[in-house]
Every structure is written in structure tokens, then in C-alpha cells.
């Protein structure tokens, strides 16, 4: 079955390329070899390759040849109060390619009154006509009702979607109850998809927002103050608990704090199938900027969960990422102009949430993890590309440099440096949250679908060239353990005889509107309390009695010790 759908954009002819002298880096090995690309695929890898004449040759001596980056979390079309992000599918994917990312996974978020299927079609239509690189889609579940089950089944069966996100925050808008989350996770497990969660305690966040506004705190600092680290960590723990009970794989998006990251790491060490996604912002900057005197700058950092103000957070997250306790990196790229952010100038709860990071992600991870000595080049490939491809089931088409894989490649210079700035970034916003940050490790050539799209600092992109990448269910990387546990977790009752002894009667609470209580035994059966019928009773106040035929003793002798005793305890 084809998931491609309608696509009116003509296919762009790929280049025939020979990449010579580079060091090919995958998640599990590195080696020097030449590489030949044709028809958008990697055709040959080795030495002394026999290739056609007249092809373009790229000299990669002293450089690395990596699989193109995969950004697992973008929101390039997220609707907020009637506004859409400044960086749409065209601008956002252009920035992605500039940073070495050749595929994104964007989140579909339905507007009120729009079904999941209709929202999916809206996203496909927008992305197909604008995306400059390949893309796929997660689908968010902002509301849960009976028809949602059929929609999820259709998205999995017919639309190539295998991941769905639920919210534990945004009360009265899209926050799910624990019971709903358990039901959704159970369904997702049966469908063979990946359950994602935005983890924050929405009830506490709402109360904190009210309290701060009552105290007159209206600026961006109120955002981070109303989202303390503990509400993220608590929600992660709760999500892990629910997922474990449902035996459903869990993917925690936007891991922003030490507490949340530790919860993911501890659960993983206990054997829970859970994945954690720190983003560019949580790895590359901190939340001290919420207190900037410049309101517009402070507002540019507003996202949920917030960037943690603790300056040691990034170091902690990169350590867990390097050790494998966290497995993937996204950007959660969702940018708004200063004018759009200013909708919340008098109330921080109205500031549109979202930060940049799609262009900076690869270099930030290299600087913070590889250049610092925390991880090697292979682990870098794993957390920026391969693990995402495995989790969401498009590996080895993406995420690997191998014969037959898509020719999405990055020629990486580990020694080159780049300073990020709003003056030079490929975004449509006035602020860059990584302003002035210098990173080692930059892409010098980027190849998408076998075409050179970045070379010598020049971007050569084509809007609409990006393809939708469908994904099948039950990815082995995720579900092998889940399937084994399903087989082992069959529950059988204890064989025993029926209990036929007495059952105590209890009062059941009255049903609303009934005004009466019912009496029930512990077995759950409702019984009417016995009432003596005095008209049929043998009791009489005078005359003969019904039990006159029973012999009675005329007297009872009380036995007591000499001198008597204060308490009579026995009669005979």
C-alpha cells in the first residue's frame, strides 16, 4: 500500500556524485572509503570504485561522511491563537538543511473541531508543497473520545503514521486524565505504534500561574516560575508508571530538567521501554534569560517545559545523552516573531510558546558532547540520526551510510567553528536563543535525496522537493521487548473452590438523585434487609405463647465466691 498521496510537485533529478577520501561514520563503526551516489541512493561504497565519467566529485579528505541528521521534533505549522509559526515548512526545512538535518518529524496538532484525519491531511497538503527535505508526521491527541480510536487505526493502517502524542499539561485545552492516558497507551500498544508524552503536571501549573498573576508577575519570568522542575519530573514518573502498566513503549518529548532526565534514566535502568528526547535548547543554553531586562529577548525563550535556569542542567543532560540514558535529540523548533510573542506582553500565559533550534542542533550536540570528550563520533551519529530512524521505523533507509540507503548525507568538518546569530541564521525571527554561542563541528556539504543542497556556504533548496516518508508499525528497536513481555505477562486466576460461607452486608452509597441507600454483601449482590412481620409473629403479650411447649428451668443459681464479686461473668 502506498502512503505517498497526491504530490503535484515535480521530482527533482538527483545528482551523480562521487565522494572521495572521507571517513564514513555510522553509529557502530567508522572507516575510510569512497562513496558513489546515483538516483538518490547510495550505490557503491569502497575503494577504487568503477563509476561513470562526467560525474561530480566531492573531495572529503580530512572530513567525515555522516548520515543526514533526523530532527524528531518540529512544530512548523503549530496553531496558536489563530497564529502560525514564523518558520513554516519551507523556511524551517531550509534552516534544517543548513544545519545538516535532512529529515524532520513534525507534529500534527488539530484545531478545535477538526478531526485527527482532517488535520493530518492539512499538514500533508502544506508540507508537500513547501518542504525542502524529507519529512514524516507524528499526530497529537488533544481530545479523547470514542471516535478517536477509529481515527488512530485509520492513521496507522492507511496514512503511514506510527507515533501519537498525549498531553499531561494545558488544562481545559488538551490535558488528558491518567485514565484516558492508560486507555490511549493500551490502544497504541495494540496498534504497534510509539506513545509520546508532553510531561508536565498541568493542574499545578495552572494554580501557579493564577498565583503569580495575582501577585502582579506578568513577564516571561512568570512562565518559568509557574513551571517548576518538579512538575516535569513528577509527570515523567507518572507517565512511566502508566506506560509500564499498559506495557506500552514510551517516548518522552522535550526533556528539559535534571529531575525529568533522571526519571527517564532510572526507568530505563529498571527495564522500562522508554526513550528521552532533550532538545537543542536544553542542551545549548539555560533559562537565566527569562529575567532579561529586554522583554522581547526574554519572551523568545518561552517554551514548555521551560528551559531550566540552573546553568548546570545542560551538562547533566549531555552526560545522560552520552551514556545512553537519553537516546535522541530534537529541536522542538516552533518560532514566533516578536510581534507575535507580544500578544502576551501583559500576561505571560498568553506568550506563544516555542524556540528555535532546527539549524543549530547538530553543531550544539557536537560541541557539547563530542568536542567536550563525552561521546565519540559514532555515538554522535546515533543520537542525531540513527536512533530516531530505528525508534520510528525508517532505518536503514535513513540514519545509515550503506548501499541502498537514501543518499541523505552530511560532509562534516569537526574542526571548523560557527557562531550563531540572528544576523546570519536562516530563520524569520528577530532573536536567536543561541546568540553568540560558538560551536565546533559544522556541515560543509549537505546532500538531500542525492542532490547537493549546501556547498561552500550556499543553500540550493527547492520548496516542495521534500517527500513524505511513511512508517510501518511495530519497529523492532522498540517492540521486541514489548512482545516478549506480552507473552510472559499472561494473567491466570488462582484455581480454588467456591466460597459458600457467610457474607457481611454493607451499605452502598446512594446513587445521585435516588436519595436512598442500598445494602449489599461483599459479593456485590444487593439484598433487602430482613423485616419481622408482626402480624404473622407468634409473640403475644398475654395468654398462651407459641413456645409454651418448650421445657424451662424454674430457676438459675448464681455461683459466686465467698464475699461475692464485683463483676458477674458466668451463669450456671
UniProtKB/Swiss-Prot annotation:
Keyword Iron-sulfur in record: no
Top-level taxon: Eukaryota
Keyword Cytoplasm in annotation: yes
Pfam families named among the record's database cross-references: Amidohydro_1
Coarse class of the protein's main subcellular location: cytoplasm
Subcellular localization, as worded in the UniProt entry: Cytoplasm
GO molecular function: hydrolase activity, acting on carbon-nitrogen (but not peptide) bonds; phosphoprotein binding
Cross-referenced PANTHER family: DIHYDROPYRIMIDINASE-RELATED PROTEIN 4, HYDRANTOINASE/DIHYDROPYRIMIDINASE FAMILY MEMBER
Family: Belongs to the metallo-dependent hydrolases superfamily. Hydantoinase/dihydropyrimidinase family.
Primary role: Necessary for signaling by class 3 semaphorins and subsequent remodeling of the cytoskeleton. Plays a role in axon guidance, neuronal growth cone collapse and cell migration.
Protein name: Dihydropyrimidinase-related protein 4
Organism for this UniProt entry: Mus musculus (Mouse)
